[in-house]
Amino acid sequence: MATQISKKRKFVADGVFYAELNEVLTRELAEDGYSGVEVRVTPMRTEIIIRATRTQNVLGEKGRRIRELTSLVQKRFKFPVDSVELYAEKVNNRGLCAIAQAESLRYKLLGGLAVRRACYGVLRFVMESGAKGCEVIVSGKLRAARAKSMKFKDGYMVSSGQPTKEYIDAAVRHVLLRQGVLGIKVKIMLDWDPTGKSGPKTPLPDVVIIHAPKDDVVYSAPAQAAAPVTLVQEAPLTTVDYPEMIPPVA
């Protein structure tokens, strides 16, 4: 028998479940280009779609790894048997995914690449992928003993209002180096896409679209109208005109 739960508790429970699931998958699939998760609840089962840049590594050999993740999620969150399914979806354009770029920058720094070179490489790749703007912030003990932050920007970036929720994709990651922990923040501003595939459908509120003027339409002269026909009303017949119409006197 299903237990009754208030709407407020339901929203909180769903948020906690999503946050914990996202944390587990972030730690487990960090090296496989994990870029987010989507949860779809149907009457029959719960579908969990994992977005990653390397889906083959997420699936594993003959689907072994995805089955292990399914068993882990099922036991951790107490799902009934065969009521949860995990799927792997490939990210179409990883240059427009902030999570994928933050993970890429993280592994570049772990590999010993200089901070400036790594950040400029990420900026260039994001802008070549069709983004409208990009911002990368790296903070921590970069060179000297004193911590500082370095900001790298390119293109156009909005920072307030409703467009930040629709156009900005942001991600934060941390990397542990020999000198300490560095913080990485990547913000990508997507471009407007009427189809909704590579960007939001709604245009920016300050965008003005000037339509091209229409061509002047040349109207031809109307055809010559025929002369109007005048109707002449005849006078009524009288006995003066026709005497035979006079009735005989009895």
Swiss-Prot record:
This is Small ribosomal subunit protein uS3z. It comes from the Eukaryota. Keywords: Ribonucleoprotein, Ribosomal protein, RNA-binding. Residues 21-92 form the KH type-2 domain. The keyword Ribonucleoprotein applies. One of its GO terms (biological process) is translation. The lineage of its organism: Eukaryota, Viridiplantae, Streptophyta, Embryophyta, Tracheophyta. Interacts with SNRNP35. Gene3D superfamilies: 3.30.300.20, Ribosomal protein S3, C-terminal domain (3.30.1140.32). Belongs to the universal ribosomal protein uS3 family. One of its GO terms (cellular component) is plasmodesma. CDD domains: KH-II_40S_S3. GO terms for molecular function: mRNA binding; structural constituent of ribosome. The gene is RPS3A.
